[in-house]
Amino acid sequence: QHVIANSSEQEFDYPKGEENVYISYPGKGGVEISNFWRKFLFGWKFDGTSLLLSGYPTKESRVMFHRNIRERVGTLAPFLKLDNDPYIVLAENKLYWIVDAYTASEDFPYSQRFRASQITRQRGDFDPVFSRHKLSYLEGSNYIRNSVKAVVDAFNGSVDLYVFDPEDPLLKAWSSVFPGLFKPREQMPDALEKHIRYPADLLLTQGLVYSKYHMTDPGVFYNQEDLWIRATEKYYGQVQPVEPYYIMWEPPDAQNAEFVLILPFTPKNRQV
């Protein structure tokens, strides 16, 4: 849904005593409605004659669209698979959204395709909604790399795509097709890089595959003697698989606690 910012109608900001404080958007996000033809074309695209006939927009007004974080990044780089869990961070006194982006393929040689529903059904890992993470966007892939971190400025909407796996061949190909679209990791501000985390969707995908392919003995693998399934827990009286979760954890002999992502498994048919 589009919005018109910096119109003649000011926005409510906060109450102050018996009065209200109003504000107009002072940023550079969106596209200026600086003349009749822009106003006409945006009105044609978004809401017919309402924008054209309204007296609220001014020459300083801006129309904002593609405001959903995943939609915004996906419009710029539709060839990337985007994580379901964008997260907001505070860095340098500003708010930013960070989205994990993946390069993926269904045609990697000698690699089994990821079939989430099939994996859970075959192993008795019941999960009727297949977790809150909804891995359907990775379904069928047999090559997945978390090669890019997308950063969206929450104030002006600018998007930066930082490369976190420069050796990824798919990303190399896309970088050559769209020079200048990606920035090296070294250009990411330190304040932002401190907020980078391992994505839960990726760990869940890797964990479901690893629950079978951790077996290295050919005989054990052939007979499927050591299959794992996700650990279970009771939640409001219902038994459900444990979702990946972040914790602060201090490893043995470590000086400081670390922010880690955990996904527990148990041997099949041996869970309590």
Predicted segments with their positions:
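Soluble extracytoplasmic regions of secretory-pathway and membrane proteins
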Residues: 1-272
